[in-house]
A protein has these predicted regions:
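Flexible, low-hydrophobicity surface segments
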Residues: 1-159, 187
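C-terminal catalytic domains of large/alpha subunits in multi-subunit enzymes
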Residues: 71-72, 234-239, 268-275, 304, ...
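Helix-loop-helix junctions that connect adjacent transmembrane helices in secondary transporters/permeases
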Residues: 148-233, 398-478, 684-696, 703-705
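Thiamine diphosphate
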Residues: 246, 250-277, 492-500
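Conserved catalytic cysteine-centered active-site region
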Residues: 103-104, 236-238, 243-244, 269-280, ...
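Glycine-rich loop/linker segments at domain edges
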Residues: 10, 16-19, 89-92, 160-204, ...
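Short Pro/Gly-enriched beta-strand edge/turn motifs at strand-loop
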Residues: 85-87, 179-194, 277-285, 326, ...
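Extended active-site and interfacial segments that coordinate phosphate-rich ligands
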Residues: 18-19, 128-141, 220, 227, ...
Length: 765
């Protein structure tokens, strides 16, 4: 019998590769008609206050100005913006705290008015002529100062500016810490506000057609966007159609509803005409979303052998001005502390707090990069204090094989951490270098460090996980695949095609995935976030492919008079399994079925799969640095990430994901920070000149390694990889600097200024 050719596990070329490298791929900007009106938003130039009046008289006189809308004109339907599945239980719904435009300004850059004009010049000039009078209010930028009794209040329903507070208790921390002979290790760890910096800034355009709102947007979450636009405008959700073309990156920023509702509303105000609303890079930094800056206080009581007797964690998560994804980021961060190094006596609290800063939302890693910086820096601090090699300490106390999380019921099926550590250690020659670097003196010193991470796949059991898929056989026997999960540049469509081809038994190039999603056409799906794409979509793809394959074989039975159990699809052909003979191609079968004068039919299948699983992804980072102590500079010279993300659907895509995440982690660790003027609340470096992203000169060669352990809860054995690569990079670099100098920095980024302060504090300079 003919052997089936496997597609899953091969580095096939991306389905969108040619379109993108030749410039033929159509992004939102490319699809918008040149006749579109241009919309621009007027942003507040104070950090906190009430809009007293908006004078648009001079702006209205400008030629080309079509419409000006102020915060006093818009409908008062409060809506959420987080890209989460909706809940029918009001207690579990996202916070509705946004209006299209606001009278109560809560951060420097808040939206107070909008202009619709015939062209860019008229729109820009009109913004400059609008005069806004404010009643200024005190503002607060520090997360813990915002919790003080006399701090200015941002939202009347949230006293103390606390959006939400969660506590975790396991065992008896207070009793356990009194055990004689324990060693106390304590530290504060701070991560910065950073921005996603995807290549394509947010853009959308909207128009009305047959009484419905049509929105084309660079969103990660088209079906969720549809719902939120309906909520924001107070209209039935079915009156909204959202189309997602190719996207130039999102990293979580576009997992929020940004300006789609406002754009739709502006179209309505000009008679349903086409209106385009895009934002500049400067606006993207401030008026979209940023990563939560989290301040973490860790206290560990350990026995002399390193065993953790008791641990306490406090996290203060800077939410910025509005709820967005809110407490879910801080809660996920806190939940990691008792799991990475299991501790029987744990006490933890996380506070998500409003401040007068840009809104924090989803960003690659969703709280885990912040948590891993604190946890893995703290772990090295423990190891150093006890005189235990950090590698040896982790080997002994990281989550063991068989560990089961009491909440999610996730199981660590393999001894993954140690497999990843061993592979990474060999790759960088870790033990030899630790011994060699221990003998260093002088101003220039080398160091090597490591850090581990874990990451959940998707959001179950916190929230809904579901995936839908539709497959249609074309006249030539090829298969059209429509999935609710979205391609946002990560290569998801290629993985979808590989999985579909694998189950159907057809060549990869016979699968066509619909990358342009349309809520009027595409099956319902939750979108791209939580590293869920391949894991979640895999369930509905496999289920739908099995249904379609069964329909195809039923048709083959009709045409060949063979028994169904003796038929299979191999390499796009109907094959008799008893002798391996090819009876017909799928093209012949499809044509015959579609055009039969006696029994014509269109072969399709559609299904929804509700997922009630989750899966741990694991891994670690090894980093090497060269530190110029007098110059207060740390140069990254080598870095290796090792991942267990289950079975690799496409090894080349997996490696690309790892490289991208490592690059983001390098920026997070060494360079990036959005700064604010303490006197005005104004952002100081919201541009790519002053916001220091890592460049090629700052990167050594990036190395990704994999430990492939088949994930038993997964349809194809795979699990999260999109976000994990960023999680452990910053603490690995920090620990390498600690190894080189004996100084451990507890605040990111580890730039020359912070190195100078720390080195001087520790007597190195």
């Amino acid at each position: 019998m003919e052997e089936r050719e496997h597609v899953v596990g091969k580095s096939v070329k991306r389905v969108d590769a040619l379109e993108k490298v030749t410039g033929r791929a159509k992004y939102t900007e490319d699809l918008c008609d040149k006749s579109a009106y241009i919309a621009r938003v007027l942003h507040a130039d104070i950090a906190h206050g009430i809009v007293r009046s908006v004078d648009t008289s001079e702006a209205q006189k400008l030629p080309g100005v079509v419409k000006i809308v102020t915060c006093f004109d818009v409908p008062k339907y409060y809506f959420p913006t987080a890209g989460h599945p909706w809940s029918t239980d009001p207690a579990h719904q996202d916070v509705k705290d946004r209006l299209l435009l606001t009278e109560h300004v809560r951060f420097y850059g808040d939206d107070v008015a909008a202009v619709v004009a015939e062209n860019e010049v008229a729109a820009a000039q009109a913004l400059r002529l609008i005069k806004v009078e404010y009643d200024p209010l005190p503002f607060v930028l520090d997360v813990q100062k915002a919790m003080e009794e006399d701090a200015p209040q941002l939202h009347e329903n949230y006293p103390g500016n606390v959006l939400k507070h969660t506590s975790i208790h396991k065992g008896d921390f207070e009793k356990a810490k009194e055990e004689p002979g324990l060693i106390k290790v304590e530290g504060w760890y701070q991560t910065p506000t950073v921005q996603h910096c995807h290549i394509e800034n947010f853009i959308c355009y909207a128009y009305m057609e047959q009484g419905r709102y049509v929105i084309v947007s660079s969103t990660q979450i088209p079906h969720i966007c549809r719902r939120v636009v309906g909520q924001a405008l107070g209209i039935p959700w079915g009156n909204v159609r959202v189309i997602k073309p190719y996207i130039g990156g999102g990293f979580g920023n576009k997992q929020d509803i940004l300006y789609e509702p406002l754009c739709a509303y502006l179209s309505q105000t000009v008679g349903g005409r086409l209106v385009k609303l895009d934002v500049s890079r400067e606006e993207t930094f401030v008026c979209n979303r940023v990563r939560h800056a989290i301040r973490t206080h860790l206290i560990s009581y350990v026995r002399p052998n390193g065993e953790i007797a008791a641990r306490k964690a406090e996290c203060f998560s800077d939410q910025g001005a509005y709820a967005s994804h809110g407490h879910s980021i801080g809660a996920k961060a806190l939940g990691s502390f008792p799991q990475l190094y299991p501790c029987e006596n744990f006490e933890g609290d996380v506070y998500t707090v409003f401040t007068n800063k840009p809104v924090s939302g989803a960003m690659r890693g969703y709280g885990i990069p912040q948590a891993m910086f604190a946890m893995e820096s703290h772990t090295d601090d423990i190891a150093v204090k006890l005189g235990i090699p950090p590698y040896e300490y982790r080997w002994k106390y990281l989550m063991p094989k068989g560990y089961t999380d009491g909440f999610s019921k996730n199981v660590n099926y393999y001894d993954t951490f140690r497999e990843c550590m061993e592979k990474g250690s060999v790759s960088v020659d870790y033990e030899r270098k630790r011994r060699e670097y221990a003998q260093q003196t002088g101003d220039i010193r080398k160091g090597i460090g490591m850090a581990a991470f874990w990451y959940n796949t998707g959001v179950w059991p916190i929230s809904l996980e579901t995936s839908s898929c539709r497959m249609v056989m074309n006249q030539d026997g090829s298969i059209q695949v429509q999935v609710g999960e979205t391609e946002i540049g990560q290569g998801a469509d290629t993985a979808f095609a590989q999985m579909a081809a694998e189950t159907l038994g057809i060549p990869f190039d016979m699968v066509h995935v619909m990358t342009v999603q349309d809520t009027d056409v595409t099956p319902f799906g939750l979108g791209a976030y939580a590293s869920r794409q391949t894991y979640m979509a895999g369930f509905s793809i496999r289920q739908t492919a099995e249904l379609l394959k069964s329909h195809i074989l039923d048709t083959a039975v009709e045409m060949t008079r063979q028994m169904k159990e003796n038929l299979d699809i191999i390499d796009g052909n109907i094959v008799r399994t008893t002798d391996g003979s090819v009876l017909m191609s799928l093209g012949e079968l499809a044509t015959e079925k579609l055009y039969s004068l006696t029994n014509c039919g269109h072969l399709t299948a559609e299904s929804t799969y509700q997922i009630k699983n989750n899966a741990y992804s694991f891994g670690c980072t090894f980093a090497e640095v060269e530190v110029d102590i007098p110059g207060c500079r740390a140069t990254l010279t080598n870095i290796v990430n090792v991942h267990d993300c289950g079975r690799l659907i496409n090894p080349a895509l997996a490696e690309a994901q790892v490289h991208g995440g490592m690059s983001m982690g390098i920026g997070f660790g060494l360079f990036e920070e959005l700064k604010f003027d303490e006197k005005t609340g104004r952002p100081l470096n919201n541009n790519l000149l002053d916001y220091k992203m890592a460049t090629f000169e700052d990167h050594p060669d990036l190395h990704g390694e994999f430990v492939e352990n088949y994930e038993p809860t997964s349809a194809y054995g795979t699990k999260a990889l999109g976000e994990p690569p960023v999680c452990s990079v910053a603490p690995a670099i920090r620990n390498a600097i600690l190894n080189a100098t004996g100084s451990g920095l507890n605040e990111l980024p580890m730039n020359p200024h912070r190195l100078f302060v720390k080195f001087r504090e520790d007597g190195l300079i």
